[in-house]
Amino acid sequence: MKNAFYFFAVLLLLSCHHASQKGHTVSVRIDPDEAENSIAADEWLGTAGCALIPLADTEKPITNATRLKTHGGKIYILDEETHCLHVFHADGTLDFSIDRRGKAGNEYLWISDFHVTDERLYLLDHIGQKILECDTLGRFIRKRDIDGYYANGIFATDEALFLVNEGSTPEAGAFHVFQFDREGAFRNKFIPFNPDRGFGSSKEYDTDGQGGLLFCQAPDDTVFLVTPEGCTPLVHIDFGRHALPEKYHHLNLLEIMRKGLYRQYVTGINRIFGNGKLVFLQYHYGDDWNWIVYDRERQ
């Protein structure tokens, strides 16, 4: 039996009422002053499968978990403090850990992100700017150098590999996403940005729950869906008069906070994730952290 969940400071988007067309992109107007304090979410979530899972001890204790992902019935936890990736079975027993810090070809300096498919496990070495490709048991297969592209994050399917660039300008140009085939050959680049913008173009991305990558670009606050077939604008979030005015876009985040603009305006989307049908977007306004819930099937 489902129980109701409540998202505090949430604004639910009924796209059939609030949405309009911006070219070929759905545009949704958001007024933070009209955000609901709570809404019932029993249509989306249930507690039937919820449980506390005690994790087995690891050789190096988990001290600062920065990434937690699930795939194929396993739990993957990246510890930024120890630079280890721990993989657990669904019952919490340890499957294996990867502790391979070093300068050799099959080692890494700093794991900033990872991604799992049915066939491969990819580790992104942010400092070394390389990718370690492993099998699903963590055994090393090969190294991929990514000099010339740069990456803060990584996403993969069985057919393609994507590098996510938050805001650097590598030799390949000021683009947020670079696409490669499974053999490592460059195929495409998506979502160009202006590197001169003060507090960056965007840093928010996650999987969509259906084999795609969601990327939200500021200051336009457009959510893109990236797949092996290409890049498509999914929805544009319009904060209207509450959005940070363009004349302030050259300021960095510290300057924006010193001027008090961070409390007066919405500076963009702060978090994003999806579960297939729904896209969850978080933003800050005044003293509140609000959530936008966008239903992709109600356009």
PLM-predicted stretches and their roles:
Residues 64-67, 109-113, 149-156, 198-205, ...:
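Repeated scaffold domains used in trafficking and secretory/extracellular systems
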Residues 20-54:
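Blade/loop signatures of beta-propeller domains
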Residues 109-110, 125-174, 187-198:
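Asp-box/WD-like beta-propeller blade repeats and closely related beta-sheet repeat scaffolds
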Residues 49-83:
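Beta-strand-rich domains and repeat architectures in extracellular enzymes and scaffolds
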Residues 27-29, 74-79, 120-125, 159-170, ...:
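Short beta-strand elements that form the blades of beta-propeller/WD-repeat-like
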Residues 45-60, 96-107, 187-203, 233-262, ...:
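Surface-exposed loop and turn segments in beta-propeller and other repeat-based domains
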